[in-house]
Amino acid sequence: MAEPWGNELASAAARGDLEQLTSLLQNNVNVNAQNGFGRTALQVMKLGNPEIARRLLLRGANPNLKDGTGFAVIHDAARAGFLDTVQALLEFQADVNIEDNEGNLPLHLAAKEGHLPVVEFLMKHTACNVGHRNHKGDTAFDLARFYGRNEVISLMEANGVGGATSLQ
């Protein structure tokens, strides 16, 4: 059910309208208010605009809320390859090991889509569970291999991931 200001706040975030977003936040609206589709402003924000994320997070937006499809914002940002947004979310305690409804971590989604900078950051600068298997039994390495993401495969192999740690 939509909450007061949920639609306006979500709309401003989705458009990347910092001016309207700031105005609404200054009026102390509930930053975790849901819009008519049951999603928060953080969940519908323009992913390529980490400043939107930071403003919402500074006001207490919960980076680990999942939407109706089981995705947290970090899943969406990793899948879309928005490294700056992933970093902003992690600055505010987004869970790097949060699972979606299929058991995928953000690393799985970034590897599947071939987003090398996101994969590299998650592997080298977070406590990401690189060997985690989703509900189908696949690791991020398995998905990178299945989808032919050769740069991701090379990076993972260079960091000791793959081979015996993944399905053959």
From Swiss-Prot:
Coiled coil ranges: none
Pfam families per the UniProt record, alphabetical: Ank_2, Ank_4
Keyword match Cell cycle: yes
Keywords for this protein: ANK repeat, Cell cycle, Repeat
InterPro entries tied to this protein: Ank_Repeat/CDKN_Inhibitor, Ankyrin_rpt, Ankyrin_rpt-contain_sf
PROSITE patterns with a match to the protein in the record: ANK_REP_REGION, ANK_REPEAT
Any one annotated GO CC term: nucleus
Domain of life the protein comes from: Eukaryota
ANK repeats: 4-33, 37-65, 69-98, 102-132, 136-165
SUPFAM superfamilies for this protein: Ankyrin repeat
Gene Ontology biological process terms, A to Z: cell population proliferation; negative regulation of cell growth; negative regulation of stem cell proliferation; oligodendrocyte differentiation; regulation of G1/S transition of mitotic cell cycle; stem cell proliferation
Matches recorded under Gene3D superfamilies: Ankyrin repeat-containing domain
GO-annotated molecular function: cyclin-dependent protein serine/threonine kinase inhibitor activity; protein kinase binding
Complex and partners: Heterodimer of p18 with CDK6.
PANTHER family xrefs: ANK_REP_REGION DOMAIN-CONTAINING PROTEIN, CYCLIN-DEPENDENT KINASE 4 INHIBITOR C
Family, per entry: Belongs to the CDKN2 cyclin-dependent kinase inhibitor family.
Function (record text): Interacts strongly with CDK6, weakly with CDK4. Inhibits cell growth and proliferation with a correlated dependence on endogenous retinoblastoma protein RB.
Protein name (database record): Cyclin-dependent kinase 4 inhibitor C
Organism placement in taxonomy: Eukaryota, Metazoa, Chordata, Craniata, Vertebrata
Gene coding for it: Cdkn2c
